[in-house]
Amino acid sequence: MKIVGITGGIGSGKTTVCRYLKELGVNIIDADEIGHRVLQNKGIRTKITDVFGNEVMNPDGNINRKILGELVFGYPERLERLNKITHPLIEQAISSLLEEYRQKGIKSVAIEAPLLVEAGWLKLVNEVWLITAPKESIFKRLHSRMGLSREQAIARIQSQATDNERLKYASVVVNNNCRFEDLKACVQLLAKERLELA
């Protein structure tokens, strides 16, 4: 089974690339989506409130990701503490899904993980595709998609590895500075060359 790690900074276009791969029959594992589910785990919620206080809880008992994000992004030590709580469970969930796909005879899987390098998940993949985009495009996406101010966007960007840091692990670099149809054509070509498609 071929396992590709799709990584890159926030707003670079990882999800779009994965959507195109999914259209080609590649199974997608979204590490952020798993991370959101992990936050619903009662034990994890308790650990998070022990570290960050009850203000990160919604009245319904779930973690308020917006408040938690404001507490950790821009504060590397806090972010590291949060990641130490959540990353082991996220990795465990990804590994379980990969094993399930292996048993089903799935040929190709892409793991969408912005923190693939930082979290130490390179061991889970056969190769890394780095998605990059111009800074201004990223700021616009983060503002329109998440309502982040420029300062909030910068804090999130700075909490992740840089493209240069990720580059040393990348087998493929996809520069997302083009039209959607050009990006799609690029992904289709890469998938045909590097993945086993059904």
From Swiss-Prot:
<keyword id="KW-0963">Cytoplasm</keyword>
<comment type="function">
    <text>Catalyzes the phosphorylation of the 3'-hydroxyl group of dephosphocoenzyme A to form coenzyme A.</text>
</comment>
<dbReference type="GO" id="GO:0015937">
    <property type="term" value="P:coenzyme A biosynthetic process"/>
</dbReference>
<feature type="domain" description="DPCK">
    <location>
        <begin position="3"/>
        <end position="198"/>
    </location>
</feature>
<keyword id="KW-0173">Coenzyme A biosynthesis</keyword>
<dbReference type="GO" id="GO:0004140">
    <property type="term" value="F:dephospho-CoA kinase activity"/>
</dbReference>
<dbReference type="GO" id="GO:0005524">
    <property type="term" value="F:ATP binding"/>
</dbReference>
<feature type="binding site">
    <location>
        <begin position="11"/>
        <end position="16"/>
    </location>
    <ligand>
        <name>ATP</name>
    </ligand>
</feature>
<dbReference type="InterPro" id="IPR027417">
    <property type="entry name" value="P-loop_NTPase"/>
</dbReference>
<protein>
    <recommendedName>
        <fullName>Dephospho-CoA kinase</fullName>
        <ecNumber>2.7.1.24</ecNumber>
    </recommendedName>
</protein>
<dbReference type="GO" id="GO:0005737">
    <property type="term" value="C:cytoplasm"/>
</dbReference>
<keyword id="KW-0808">Transferase</keyword>
<keyword id="KW-0067">ATP-binding</keyword>
<comment type="similarity">
    <text>Belongs to the CoaE family.</text>
</comment>
<comment type="pathway">
    <text>Cofactor biosynthesis; coenzyme A biosynthesis; CoA from (R)-pantothenate: step 5/5.</text>
</comment>
<dbReference type="Pfam" id="PF01121">
    <property type="entry name" value="CoaE"/>
</dbReference>
<keyword id="KW-0547">Nucleotide-binding</keyword>
<dbReference type="InterPro" id="IPR001977">
    <property type="entry name" value="Depp_CoAkinase"/>
</dbReference>
<keyword id="KW-0418">Kinase</keyword>
